[in-house]
Each structure stands twice: as structure tokens, then as C-alpha cells.
Amino acid sequence: MGKIIGIDLGTTNSCVAVMQGTKPTVIENSEGYRTTPSMVAFTKNGERLVGHAAKRQAITNAENTIFSIKRFMGRKFDEISNEKKIAPYKVTNVNGEARVEIGDKTYSPQEISAMILQKMKQTAEDFLGEKVTEAVITVPAYFNDAQRQATKDAGKIAGLEVKRIINEPTAASLSYGLDTKNENEKVAVFDLGGGTFDISILELGDGVFEVKSTDGDTHLGGDDFDQKIIDFLADEFKKQEGIDLRNDMMALQRLKEAAEKAKVELSSRTDTEINLPFITATQEGPKHLVVNLTRSKFEALCSDLFDSLIAPCKRAIKNSKLKTSEINEVVLVGGSTRIPKVQALVEELFGREPNRSVNPDEVVAVGAAIQGGVLSGDVSDVLLLDVTPLSLGIETLGGVMTKLIEANTTIPSKKQEVFSTAADNQTSVEVHVLQGERPMASDNKTLGRFHLGDIPPAPRGVPQIEVAFDIDSNGILHVSAKDKATGKEQSIRIEASGKLNDAEIEKMKEDAKTHAAEDEKRKEAIDLKNSADALIFSTEKQLGELGDKVPADKKTQLEEALEKLKEAHKSENVETIKPAMDELNTIWNDVASTMYQTPSGDTPPSEPETGASEESKGGDKTQGDGEVDAEYEVIDGNDKDK
């Protein structure tokens, strides 16, 4: 049985881990980083870049660089008005669903997420040296059914069988509590990531991880803090220069990067200077942005965001039926928990200093890997009892939502209830499935609708319709309705907004495979071109060094073959490069044989380097994303993005 990897599919960054024996291991990507930016870019020549390669070119290719796609997952177009405003890429409405438009193509959020998942899958395969087909993927605890389905679809498109969808705070608790299985602890996991906020209260003991309650906000995260700084910088520049930088996509992307950097710096410093030279230009000349931002100003700008963290925490504590004093630890998860004001707020809310023993960027992926180990049998004596974050029910007479499964019910769970008709001789009923906490159906999230027909005519209230809700361990809902008189039953697996049908998923899977093949072909072409480049260089060098020692006829042959290879190299045609390289290498072999037989005693030339190992020869290094980095010398190996 192959390994089940754990993937934290984040709004800003993603991370992949796997169990190695009894220990979880976070896997470095091809660039040497333990987390990968959740970014996808499409270049002018049709190349697709994922992760750091996409991030590096985001400023100059803002309209074709997609980030924070997680915020669009499983949501209708009319639900994403705020997110759409701040995205430099184009988000369009296709039959009520949100789609990203790049050139003449549109992509669903699931497809973009699948590209990120493919990168994580490839990272794991490179590390393990074997194919990976199964994964545990994490989602925010407060994700609804549609968002969970969309995440599962993304996994399918990426070629992964999603063995389990697991809540991020629950995954973090697995990582935190794996070594404390014999202690009875009540733990709050405070998870503030790039795009979402979750708070979960759990009880850990004897290998059982039981979620008591969960709450959160799927529209609150690091992106929102960045946006506050972006708006502040844009407003300041507009006051000074009369130019709104928000109308310039390239300038806006530079503001975004500067805002993120400033936010990070203000976690360890009380002030920072934001200096963006040549941010724009007018007839008078170039304009520069220089603004000093203090930590206190940042906290004032984001005061409403900090306030928004309080209510979910209070609700989660109340629903857990625990007192704040009974909670033993508060574990911080997500990069945004590094903000000092957030840490102070947590300490004030829970009356204790937060626990910083886990890596907030990696702990969720580690927990997902542990759950993968549980499912594959590599990890024993661990039982995970999660909950559904929101109540589930149906619309009944008068437009009221009648709850069948309450929020914070342990999953998997099944509940049945008997309903009847609202009118005389009614022969069919519509089951309108809802998720949320509001009393009126119209104020809650519609998950789906289906009909049960052929009900025998009878007076109102006589037919007995049994509605059953079955929520699985992924938090995904299945609903059935049965006429108890006839035994006729209708059931559905909820297919809500953003849910792709099987045909769409299969098509996207094929597209993903095609892209993977294209990426591999492009990589092979780059490797071959680099090898040709190395052969041209070494041939010219050796011809110069050997001079007249090479027989005249052989020298002519070498020069002719060299010119042929140069022409092929310029054309970038793989079909002509390979034969030209083979011809030149064959002539070099003849030259070496001839010179071995010369009486002069000179050392014959070695066969020129063909670029088979570019790194050792100073050739170009090709990254997994198909991007070629220029030759460079590392000055400070520690200078990495955090």
C-alpha cells in the first residue's frame, strides 16, 4: 500500500507532509522551501507556473497570476463581490459560478487548486521516489458542504483519491497532541491563516481527540490585514500625488508584496519604512512611494479585524460547555498568529499565554499526515472525533428552517425525522436542504434541492415522509426522503454551488494530465538545450586550447558540426538539436581516437561535457515548474522567504 500524504491547501501557502515510520516529515519542494505559495501563473508563451516560480513574476504578470483561490472555492459568483474587487486577475460569471478568465480560457477554482495540489503531489513523489495517489487534505473548520465538496473535486482533478477531508484546527491538534496521548487536556486551537479564521475547542486524552465545539469566519485572514495596508498606502499616495495606484495592476501587485512584507516586519519591529521607487510615472517624471508605518498605526488600521476575532472565540467556548479556566492550552496555528496584537488578544480572551510550541506554518500538514498514517495503519491508538461546524436542516411550512443535525454534532452522524404534506392531495414534495444557524430558510445557505414524487393523494398531514440526513467523516452530506406508505425513496449526495459533475471532473483530470505531460516535455526540451549549450561551450574551448594539434580534416569536420549545432540551438527545435549533438560527439570520439595514436605523447582531448549534469558544470538549472533560473552564485544561503 502506498503512502497517504497530508496536504495543507492554504490560502497563501500550502504544505505537504508524510509519515516516515512513526514520525511525520514536512517535505521540501524542488526550490528547497518547506511551504509553497498557493499561486498559479500563465505566461505569454502558454507556460504554467506554480508556487515560487509564479510568485517571482507576479508583479510583471499581475493579470495572469492567480492567488487566494481558496476564497472562491464552492461559492457562487454573487457571493464573492468583495474578493473579486481586490483580485488583479479577471473573475467572471459562468452560469452563476465564479470562474477565473485567463486569455480565451476560463478555469474553475477547483482546477486552479488542483494545479497547486499537483505541485504538492509532485513534491511528495520526488521525496518518496514512488507514485502518490492518496491524500488527506485539510480545510477550514468553518467550510460549508459546498466548499468541502469543491476541495474534494480539486483533489480528484489533481489525480488524488482524497481519503479524508479534515478540519485544519483538528489536524493541528493531532500534531500537537500526538506526544501527549496519555494526558487529559482541554485545548483551544486558534487558527488564523491567510484567508480564514477557525477556533476549535478539543479534549485530548488516551489517544482520543474529541472536538467539543468549533466556530470561525471564512472571510477573515492575513489577506485582509494586507488589504488594510494596501488601502492605507494607496490613499496616502493619492493625497500626495493625486494618483490612485489601485487602477494600475502592476503597481497594485507591488503594493500587495510591500504590504505583506511590512506586516511581517511589524511582528518583530515597532515601525517599518515602505519604499517603492518608480511606482508610477507622469509627464513630470517618475513617482516614488515612501511611507513610514508604525505598529500602532497598523493596529489602528486593522482594529475592526481584531475585533472580529473575539465573537467566534466566545461562541466556541460557550458551545464547548467549558469555562475558560478549564482550558489548559491555547495553540496558535497559521502565519497571521505571529502578529503581536493577535497574541495579546488571545492571552486576554483565554487568560493564559498562548502555546507557541508548534510551527504555525507546518503544523496543519503534519496533522494531516498523521491522519493519513491512521488511515493506512501506520499510526495506531489514535481516534479522531470531529464535529460539523454548522447546523443542517430543511425548509418547512412558512419558510422556516427545521434543523435535523445541530452545529457541533460529532461526525459521522445520521438523523431521521418524519414530515408531511402542506396541502390536500399533494403528490410530490420538494426537499430544500439548508446549512446555517438562522431561523428563516432564506437567510441560510442552500446546499441543494430534490423532489420526491408519486405520493398517493391524501389529505394534508396524512402522508408520512421520512427525511434522513447522513453526514460522513469528511463533513459531506447525503440526504434521502422516503414515502413510508409506498416505500418509494429518493436520495442525493448534495451537489451545491460550485459542485462539478463527474463529466466536468473527468475532463479537468484529462486536462491536468495533458498539462503535466506538456510540462515534462518542456522540461526535457530545456534540459536538452542546456546540454547543447554546454557542448558548444566546451567544443569552442577545446578547439582553442588544442589548436593545430587537431588534424586539419578533423578540425574542419568539428567546426562544421559545431555550426550545425549552433543553428539547431538557435531554432530551439528538439528534433534537430539531438542529432546535431550526436554528430558532434561522434566526431570528437574520432578525434580522441586519432590523437591517442599520435607519437607526440600529448594528452588527447577528453570528450566535451554534454551538460548531463548541469549543476556541476555551471549550466542552467531547470526547476520543476518548467522555469529556467539564470546562472547565479549563492552569497547567503539563509536568505529565504519566510
Curated annotation (Swiss-Prot):
Region described as Disordered: spans on this chain: 593-642
Modified-residue entries (Phosphothreonine), positions: 196
Keywords: ATP-binding, Chaperone, Nucleotide-binding, Phosphoprotein, Stress response
Record's note on what induces expression: By stress conditions e.g. heat shock.
Family matches, as Gene3D superfamilies: 1.20.1270.10, 3.30.420.40, Actin, Chain A, domain 4, Substrate Binding Domain Of DNAk, Chain A, domain 1
Transmembrane segments: none
Keyword Transmembrane helix attributed: no
Compositionally skewed regions (Basic and acidic residues) per UniProt: 614-624
GO MF terms, alphabetically ordered: ATP binding; ATP-dependent protein folding chaperone; unfolded protein binding
Recorded family membership: Belongs to the heat shock protein 70 family.
Function per UniProt: Acts as a chaperone.
UniProt cross-references to HAMAP family, sorted A to Z: DnaK
Protein name as it appears in the record: Chaperone protein DnaK
Record organism: Chlorobium phaeobacteroides (strain BS1)
Gene that this sequence comes from: dnaK
